[in-house]
Amino acid sequence: MAIHLYKTSTPSTRNGAVDSQVKSNTRNNLIYGQHRCSKGRNARGIITARHRGGGHKRLYRKIDFRRNEKYIYGRIVTIEYDPNRNAYICLIHYGDGEKRYILHPRGAIIGDTIISGTEVPIKMGNALPLSTDMPLGTAIHNIEITLGRGGQLARAAGAVAKLIAKEGKSATLKLPSGEVRLISKNCSATVGQVGNAGVNQKSLGRAGSKCWLGKRPVVRGVVMNPVDHPHGGGEGRAPIGRKKPATPWGYPALGRRSRKRNKYSDNLILRRRSK
């Protein structure tokens, strides 16, 4: 991703650094609907995820995470911006006339060809099962957890996992979070890294740009009232009045593990991610 700096004319352009993406106005049957987030509310209208709401209207892009168009070569026609994710997406035209969106592999350009199947070359953008001749140390993304369900791991911008080992019916992967876990060798993955890896270098420059993304302001608990937060209350700039920081619901805020106990996948995780 190329970072674009504007000539300084306003405070927002002075502090902003955006990616110089190419937005496409392509309209096809893969772009549909008015995709609006739930604004952090559940079905009863109660806030379950804070700091969400507003944002610009979005159209949903149907992404092919399954890559089940087997043994048919496809050509990258466009590289487009997707408002629903940080990664870019590619429009693929397959030889049988099928058109699908996939996540943009880093380094792929317009005109490149991709293919999916069991006996395909180990090439960037190709999708194949882990049980094939994929060498150890291969960088992969869009990894399936359940066979046939589609990729669920390593799909964010710049995400990449590494194939560490193969033994028996399982393959050992190191995920972007640092977690090391087992995956069935029958599951598929895409070779390469997800594009737009420099998205963390982007600076929005002003609060209004954050609102366009559907992210609302974050208020510190120490400036709230006692009824709203355990850190609230006091006269002037008072300390939190506790030994350790707490969440708005009174639980320890720093270092507390939030993963549920006795999950089915506990036996598959060889090393936990670093918190």
Curated annotation (Swiss-Prot):
Its main location: plastid. Residues 1-20, 225-275 are annotated as: Disordered. GO terms for molecular function: rRNA binding; structural constituent of ribosome; transferase activity. It holds the Pfam family Ribosomal_L2. It is found in: Plastid, Chloroplast. InterPro entries: NA-bd_OB-fold (IPR012340), Rib_uL2_dom2 (IPR014722), Ribosomal_uL2 (IPR002171), Ribosomal_uL2_bac/org-type (IPR005880), Ribosomal_uL2_C (IPR022669), Ribosomal_uL2_CS (IPR022671), Ribosomal_uL2_dom3 (IPR014726), Ribosomal_uL2_RNA-bd_dom (IPR022666). The keyword Ribonucleoprotein applies. One of its GO terms (biological process) is mitochondrial translation. Keywords: Chloroplast, Plastid, Ribonucleoprotein, Ribosomal protein. The keyword Nucleotide-binding does not apply. Part of the 50S ribosomal subunit. This is Large ribosomal subunit protein uL2cz. The gene is rpl2-A.
